[in-house]
Amino acid sequence: MLLTLAASLLIVNAVVIDGTGAPRRSAAVRVRGDRITEVGALAPAPGEAVVDAKGLVLAPGFIDTHSHGDRGLFEHGDALAAVSQGITTIVVGQDGGSPPLADFFARLDREPAAINVASYAGHGRLRGKVMGEDFRRHARPDEVARMRELLAQEMKAGALGLSSGLEYDPGIFSARSEVLDLAKVAAASGGRYISHVRSEDRYFWDAIDEIITIGREAKLPVQVSHVKLAMHSLWGQADRLLRMLDEARAAGVDITADIYPYLYWQSTLTVLFPERDFQNRATAEFVLREISTADDLLLGRFAPEPSYAGKTLAEIARLRGTDPPATLMALIQEALAFEAAHKDDDDVESVIGTSMSEPDLERLLAWPYANICTDGELDGRHPRGFGTYPRVLGRYVRERKVVSLEEAVRKMTGLAAHNVGLRDRGAIRPGAFADVVLFDPATVIDRATTRDPQARAAGIQRVWVNGAVVYEAGAPSGRRPGRALRRETTR
């Protein structure tokens, strides 16, 4: 039976982990409508629905602070990739890309999804709207002024703040001063700044300095998106990075990070060439030596030749009879030509690359100010789209003991809500919204892989959003209780 919380529900015999980091405790949780009303030793009221948790963990619903679920959200309204791993809220508008938010939120009001959705306003979209195709340069003062006006409108529409993707077009061509000016607009509205920083490899330390500087000078909270050391010669330097972040925090900069529990990322082939020198063989050789080997670059999508999806660069090179650097350069040229001929297709190619080390990942994941995110989409081309949260709970809590269960839940809920500025979510307490997940800590684990990226996780028993069941017994309920979470109210 699919249970809803339309009137009153009591969840009994639960091990409650409340999202604050406090020790687990046995308790019952009462929900009326969309809110948690009581937590403690509670007896069922007459006529009240009762769920027996049977000693499983009841936690706040997980909050994905870096999601690309806005792509295909209205086509995948059940948000199966999210709810099947316990996610109840996603934060979109990432990496500098966002839809016009007034229209987006209005549509969510009319056509709600199974999950809650908040959004940043994307720097790349603002830049593209003002500069059009002439973006391969620094913006003029009048252009920055126009971007500021547009951002102010997006903040009024409910954006959490400003996002940037400074390894991507068009943001990669921006001056630091441009981003700082826009961050000040977000700050003036009580917003924040989240960034896929300007480099996760060659120019990494300068990129971290940039986001710290923006936080200090714009006087707003800043978050490093999907923090990683994505170059072989950077491996082993997680402690150096954490010292920089801790020193910035000690100096008054509210800097945080989010992270996903995989050694491989998903992005585009072009991002591997920060100078956009796509025909420079020396750059291609550097990529395959320092960033990811040909055996570790896996195409997720390649519109010019769809059969390449699921093949590594090494495999494609053998098929074509060319060496990996030449193959990499040729694939980019073919993708650019396809993109030029198909202006409406903004998803021409994607690649999954293995670039991180396990010790660095574990050090960064354990940092007290790093919350968990997926960086995933609802169609799950990278296994993080379906597996992130169960992977943390199974691999990094139960098996490797990198963090405690209480700390992991805090990173998925209370800390995540704090780091993006959401109120009354990410907690099990009276007055909080009834976004909750029931899971088995002994069996929860991810099943998604690069070959089967949409395999559902094990151990997630039941998920509620705003008091309604959205996932139970391995299946979505069909309900759409999610809400648009605008910054003014974030509810």
Describe the function of each predicted region:
Residues Q153-E210:
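Divalent metal-binding pocket/active-site signature
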Residues A14, V29, D34, G55, ...:
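Divalent metal-coordination and catalytic microenvironments
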Residues A102-D109, A113, G124-R140, M147, ...:
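Polyanionic/metal-chelating signatures
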Residues V16-A28, A340-A341, D345-M356, L361, ...:
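Acidic, glycine-enriched loop/beta-strand segments at the rims
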Residues V16-G61:
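Histidine-rich, glycine-flanked metal-binding segment
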Residues G61-G72, Y193-S199:
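Histidine-centered catalytic micro-motifs
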Residues N280-R281, E362-Y369, D375, T388, ...:
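C-terminal cap of metal-dependent C-N hydrolases
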Residues A53-L58, F62-S67, E75-S164, A183, ...:
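Divalent-metal coordination cores built from histidine and acidic residues
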